[in-house]
């Protein structure tokens, strides 16, 4: 889960925008408290969303606290108090981030590979701690990445088979409670992983074609240029299918807190990103390049 999940700020009420920022900052502090500063460098809106959904069954929201941090050393910022949802999101964030390092190490060459190796060394201790807390999730993520590497080596043209690996990774970090909620969350985050993988593949078409890197969208539609206008409709349909399944799963959750904020992200934010990527005008964080600020 890296980079595409975010709310539409213009449609948020002030208290909802504040709440999103508080959870983002709260997750940063939860990661720092358990894993140190290193992994806070890879904090994302995606895992902030995961924390919101994971904690949505709670009836009450604890009052926010005010803390200083590396990004704001002189002024205390409002942030969410650490709770079970933020701890879970912190653990999940470390697992997914470290395995991303491992994936880069396997895929990249030259300086990029050396940098990935450095990140793996720096992140190893935190990863071992997170793996001890979520061993089943770690094994599922590892197996999914192995399957993805095999598909990449085969130059598999199936978008569904390739996206399934990402889906299994995001679903792996869902709490294993054995109840109906787990099944709903598993389906929800499976489809979120599918959507993320395919949106990322569309976004990377030009780069992957230039570098001759694996991209199932390019292979499936036998693209000769980065222009997707001829295949936009089927791409849009497959992305909308995942969005529809995500929306249906959310409707089954009956969240008790942060429902409107989560709904903004699912029903507005993700469709907006889909359109922007297909139109070729998607920009990270609305083009400001300042991560962590709505």
Where on the chain are the PLM-derived regions?
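Acidic catalytic motifs of isoprenoid enzymes
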Residues: 1-166, 170-187, 194, 198-242, ...
